[in-house]
């Protein structure tokens, strides 16, 4: 934050490919203390797939929810989106963190993910959510191989026609290492 970040993303459950899930209690215990320390000082994005974690974080002062499951993991997350109207990232991913890389199959990754977002937007609107605090994340590295990731980066502008801001997460991405042939990415 002191180096220029406008927001810090905090999460208590790893969602990197191959990771194992943690229960709600474990996840909350991992983030509760840090949120208490920083949420009033620094804008916080809460990275979670669980509605109760989202609601607890929002009540503490979290400014944005980052749902890497794209509203797919916990059916109650859409109620949080409707109730609180804070910015909410809907990320594209397939499967679960544990198996997503095995499910990296697309006819055309750009169009398939575009259709995925169209379906999520229809779902949101069908639930009576009118606000536009939605951010779309094509999920670089989440259920995608090197070719998929590169095509998404090259063609990310296709998603602008959906009418929402686009977020491209780039933390610790293995494909950067694969391209650069360096181990420090």
Predicted regions and their residues:
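Catalytic domains of carbohydrate-active enzymes, especially glycoside hydrolases
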Residues: 1-11
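Phosphate/pyrophosphate-binding loops at sites that engage ATP/ADP/AMP, CoA/4′-phosphopantetheine
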Residues: 5-6, 43, 118-133
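Active-site-adjacent loop and "lid" segments of alpha/beta metabolic enzymes
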Residues: 15-33, 37, 43, 51-52, ...
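Active-site metal-binding loops of divalent metal-dependent hydrolases
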Residues: 140
